[in-house]
Structure formats: structure tokens, C-alpha cells
């Protein structure tokens, strides 16, 4: 055999070796993909963490009431977990770190999901937050002067609730082409009283009340800011569309203990308690879910 023939035969082995390396790499990659793609999702046990908004102390009381008086009948134990950052909380629910959250209404959830793409679903209306108009200067809405300065929430979902309230009592008109529950200041088409609107974070409103004519927000926030409830000049019935929702990660909705969780929150004993409780963190702050 010549040296030339030996060189050719030796060279011909390399394509086969290269192909073998590629095949082994593909097999390894497929195995990795399969192990990750088929990794089991979170499976919830009978002890479930439920998130609440720490600034809304009554929400914690709701979870604790259900845990003590209702959840045992469904074979569950609930643990209330307070997290201030709403996006962090919703991410934790979507990822299965928490079984659910009760801090938001459907319009806030839509805002969060649209911005972050979380897989979350509303399930059961839990309660409604008392929401109204406060003033340090006037004793009724009718007393608000022409050109009064009114503070509304600076976040889209709750600003819509404030403006819809003003439209329902005839003080402003909103663009009929816009969903009123998500309206913004730019959607005001009629302002016969010449109100001047300012935007503030809900938690800041109580501190600013003495520098404006009126502010619109949640009773719980004004309570937390030590604003007496007699500073409230209008508390209309809370509309169901802004009810707190038990929000669950969409992939987990059919799990046995999540179904039981939904049943526990839908138990009529909760609404009866909300109606009759004397707990100062709940009474007049979180109210039963209305029919409309």
C-alpha cells in the first residue's frame, strides 16, 4: 500500500466521526429539551399561601377568617403572605409560588397581564373595597366650588374607578367611545364645574388632603393615613365590577386543592361575616360583594 492510499483512507474517517459527534449532540439536546418540557408543574398540597396587600390590613383578616372558619371544611390550611410589590406578587402566583392573591380587581389584573404577560385568571369575587370622596374643607359633594381641585389615583385602573364615580353622580362626562371603568383624565369630555384634577399615588392621598378640595380613593388608604372617616363626603355603593378577585395561576386552575380553594372563598359564610363583623380593619372598609 502506498503512502498516498493510506492518507486517503485515513482522511475518509473524519466525515464519519464528525457526523457521529453531531448525532450525539442532537440526542443530548433532545434529552435536555424533553426533560425540561415534561418537567411536572407545581402541584399544590393542602397548605396554601395566599397573597394580600400589606397596606390593606383587612385583606389579611379575610384570609385568616377563611383559614379559621371555612378552609378546614375543605381540607385546607391557608397562610396569609403580605408582599408590597404587586407585580412581584402576581409573578409569584403565576409561577406557583403562591396559590392565589386577593389584592386586585379585574381591571387592575388586566393592566398587569397586558404589561407582563402573566398567565393569571380571576375566579371568585371575594369582597369590595369601600371607595369614596374625602374632603378636609367641605361637608358634601354639592358644596365643592367651581374650579375645585380634586385628586384622583395616578394608576390607570383606579383612576378609571374615580372618574366613573364622578360620571355616575353627574359631575363630569366621559367619552362614550371609551370603557368608563378604564377612563383616563384625557377622556373627560364634559366638566361643567371646571374641576382641576391632579394625580397622586393612592398611598400619598391622605397626606395631601389638607392641600386640595377633595380626593377620591379607598377607605382603607385614608384609614391607614389616620384620616377620620367623617372626612368622607360620599361613599356610593361599591360596584361589583371592581370587586376583589381570587386570582389563580391559569395552569393550576384544575388542580384538586385549587378547586377546593375556590370553593372555600365562594362559601357564603364569608359574605355573611363581611356583613356583620365588628373588626375595625374590615367593617366599613371591605364590604360584601354586591349584586351589580
Regions found by a protein language model. Give the residues of each.
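Ligand-binding clefts/hinges and TM-proximal coupling segments of bilobed small-molecule sensing domains
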Residues: 29-32, 157-182, 262-292
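Short, polar/charged alpha-helical segment
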Residues: 42-77
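Ligand-binding "clamshell"
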Residues: 111-123, 136-138, 209-211, 216, ...
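A conserved helix-loop-strand patch within extracytoplasmic ligand-binding domains
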Residues: 123-173, 271-272
